[in-house]
């Protein structure tokens, strides 16, 4: 692995970005290795904000200051790891940590995201490499429960409008941030207005009036930059708009509350045919931290926005609307991403929704659901894109809730659930499907095809989360509905029964699984024939059940028969044939048929080496199992050689901190102990224990197993 590495998308600095030595001095002196700092607005809350209303008080440029700090550390090579996290939800934090673990630790991205995140946090606490983790827009303390990044070589930077009470100052220092100073504001304005110096007339007065509000300065400069008016002309428009707002709302309106309305008027002038405002409302109902640009060019988005513009027939026309919003200072676009990422400040989103009449935001959200579903690729397309899509879906759900079920919009719930499962966010996926399954039965009826699908997904997500006992009632319920609707001999019913058999095994119901799977084998054979792959799969599952029920002889006979028929029907080196043969070898070993076990493992090893290569993870796994069989046979020297080979290959292919590598290191230590190399065994176990403490949670089974082995071999 080449260091330094980074994970997550750091928002690009705004056009004309200026350093803030007066309004944000000393952050580098406060945020040193081993510390954590929260960037918060310096302005105290003066009044409660109504639900859904824009809160302009927190717009002090927190994210931009954090981005500048992060990039400065990166450019100066003061850190080896930079992790940028959209911390607006626990889902996003887990997803970001899982991606960072893959980059920094070489962790298998297929692992459970909660477990991977816990290992990453543990790694941060112990690594000698300097790191920075930015938690951008953290709003709920419970979102970082068990996920707080800390360590002697690391820095944690949080941006938040209001510091969650559960964090408090024992976790981090508060760095209050105000708006730009007068000098900084003027520097920014003059830096943006370089093409026509005549536009600078009145710049000092405009900087004073805007009061250092970063977004107001950005929006005003965007309007000026895409027009011919001067700062003095803009001030005249600003004053008129301020007077209108002052007459309709209590108190003095914030500068940004005025500038954004001027931006909307300017955008409409840049593209007067009508689609700009509908496209703006679409952006306002999605997650403003990161909106995949492809959403705006979908047919659903074009249809919605085009109703005000006699149709938007081409994707490039829709994208032109979005770039117009950028020119007017309403959104930013990061075109270094694929697809381009559109960002919109949450307070501005709330203002747009609040200013929209009647059910316009709801209709926009329902249209956005269709557009999001259309833009969502069949494969999630990377952790960052997947998280952005899920976050946009969550924004829609918060806005319209159960109204998604009135039409076809609820399909976005199903796509989100699938994405959670694909990202191995197992606990969150189970909670999501629990909600979707209940809502689907309520709105569509228990026998609707989508209700059956939701129940199916819930059962599988419970199973994936290790909650087999909770999965079983749903397996039974869905199976009952399938039988009543499709019949007991329908292929979909039989396939579901097969999965239920595996769920019974996971829940400890081995005998019930045997009964079910014996019938399944018979039905599959009658339906498809004895040599059909689905029949052979059912036999494999039945053999698993026999072994789990302690009926090893029957299990071995079934594996033998299936292995022979797979070799004849699918080929000796087919992946499924080798998988069955490996199960047979495992069963032989449990039954103490060591000679048979060795022969079967050798056959699998030959097949894996031939089809996958000698260094594939599956080949390394079978070498490790073969070594254990040799050890059981008393051929200790051969066992040690194979264990050493498996450990070495695993380190090279998977990395020294991968859980499989650590497991093989434990196997090697036990082999050393068996041949009397006590010192080597103890040394290896101590090294493994240190690595487990570094990359695994304290309660991880491997961590506990290593500690027990050390206690037994070395006396502690």
Where on the chain are the PLM-derived regions?
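Aliphatic-rich helical/repeat scaffold segments used for oligomerization and domain docking
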Residues: 1-438, 442, 453-457, 465-480, ...
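Intrinsic-disorder-linked linear interaction elements in eukaryotic regulatory proteins
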Residues: 293, 298-302, 317-323, 337, ...
């Amino acid at each position: 692995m080449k260091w330094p590495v980074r994970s997550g998308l750091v928002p690009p600095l705004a056009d004309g970005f200026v350093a803030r030595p007066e309004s944000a001095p000393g952050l580098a002196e406060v945020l040193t290795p081993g510390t954590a700092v929260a960037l918060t607005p310096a302005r105290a809350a003066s009044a409660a904000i109504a639900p859904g209303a824009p809160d302009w008080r927190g717009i002090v440029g927190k994210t931009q200051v954090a981005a500048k700090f992060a990039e400065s550390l990166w450019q100066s090579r003061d850190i080896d790891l930079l992790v940028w996290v959209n911390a607006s939800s626990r889902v996003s934090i887990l997803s970001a940590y899982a991606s960072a673990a893959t980059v920094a630790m070489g962790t298998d991205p297929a692992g459970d995201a909660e477990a991977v995140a816990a290992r990453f946090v543990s790694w941060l606490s112990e690594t000698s490499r300097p790191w920075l983790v930015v938690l951008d827009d953290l709003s709920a303390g419970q979102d970082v429960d068990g996920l707080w990044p800390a360590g002697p070589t690391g820095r944690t930077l949080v941006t938040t409008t209001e510091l969650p009470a559960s964090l408090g100052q024992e976790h981090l220092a508060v760095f209050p941030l105000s708006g730009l100073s007068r000098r900084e504001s003027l520097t920014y304005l003059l830096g943006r207005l370089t093409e026509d110096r005549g536009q600078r007339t009145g710049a000092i007065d405009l900087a004073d009036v805007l009061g250092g509000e970063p977004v107001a300065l950005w929006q005003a400069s965007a309007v000026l930059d895409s027009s011919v008016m001067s700062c003095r002309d803009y001030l005249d428009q600003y004053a008129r708009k301020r007077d209108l707002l002052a007459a309709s709302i209590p108190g003095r309106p914030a500068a940004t509350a005025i500038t954004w309305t001027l931006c909307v008027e300017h955008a409409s002038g840049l593209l007067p045919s009508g689609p700009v405002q509908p496209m703006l409302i679409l952006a306002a109902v999605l997650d403003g931290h990161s909106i995949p640009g492809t959403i705006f060019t979908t047919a659903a988005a074009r249809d919605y926005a085009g109703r005000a513009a006699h149709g938007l027939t081409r994707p490039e026309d829709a994208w032109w609307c979005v770039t117009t919003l950028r020119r007017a200072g309403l959104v930013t676009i990061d075109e270094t991403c694929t697809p381009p990422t559109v960002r919109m400040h949450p307070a501005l989103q709330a203002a747009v929704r609040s200013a929209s009449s009647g059910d316009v935001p709801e209709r926009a959200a329902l249209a956005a659901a269709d557009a999001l579903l259309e833009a969502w690729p069949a494969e999630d397309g990377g952790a960052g894109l997947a998280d952005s899509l899920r976050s946009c879906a969550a924004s829609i759900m918060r806005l319209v809730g159960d109204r998604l079920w009135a039409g076809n919009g609820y399909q976005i719930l199903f796509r989100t659930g699938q994405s959670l499962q694909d990202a191995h966010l197992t606990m969150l996926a189970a909670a999501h499907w629990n909600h979707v399954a209940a809502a689907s039965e309520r709105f569509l009826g228990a026998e609707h095809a989508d209700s059956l699908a939701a129940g199916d997904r819930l059962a599988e997500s419970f199973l994936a989360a290790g909650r087999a006992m909770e999965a079983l009632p749903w397996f039974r319920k869905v199976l009952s509905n399938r039988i009543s609707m499709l019949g007991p001999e329908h292929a979909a019913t039989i396939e579901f029964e097969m999965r239920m058999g595996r769920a019974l095994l996971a829940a400890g119901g081995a005998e019930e699984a045997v009964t079910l799977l014996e019938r399944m084998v018979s039905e599959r054979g009658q339906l498809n024939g004895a040599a059909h792959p689905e029949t052979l799969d059912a036999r494999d599952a039945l053999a698993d059940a026999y072994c789990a029920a302690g009926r090893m002889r029957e299990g071995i006979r079934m594996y033998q028969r299936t292995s022979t028929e797979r070799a004849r029907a699918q080929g000796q080196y087919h992946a499924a044939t080798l998988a069955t043969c490996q199960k047979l070898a495992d069963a032989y070993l449990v039954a103490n048929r060591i000679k048979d076990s060795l022969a079967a493992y050798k056959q699998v090893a030959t097949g894996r080496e031939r089809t996958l290569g000698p260094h594939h993870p599956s080949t390394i796994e079978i070498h490790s199992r073969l070594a254990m069989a040799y050890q059981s046979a008393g051929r200790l020297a051969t066992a040690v050689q194979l264990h050493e080979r498996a450990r070495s290959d695993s380190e090279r292919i998977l990395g020294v901190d991968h859980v499989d590598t650590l497991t093989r290191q434990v196997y090697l230590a036990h082999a050393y102990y068996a041949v009397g190399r006590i010192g080597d065994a103890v040394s290896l176990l101590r090294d493994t224990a240190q690595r487990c403490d570094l990359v695994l949670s304290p309660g991880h089974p491997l961590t506990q197993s290593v500690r027990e082995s050390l206690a037994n071999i070395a006396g502690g």
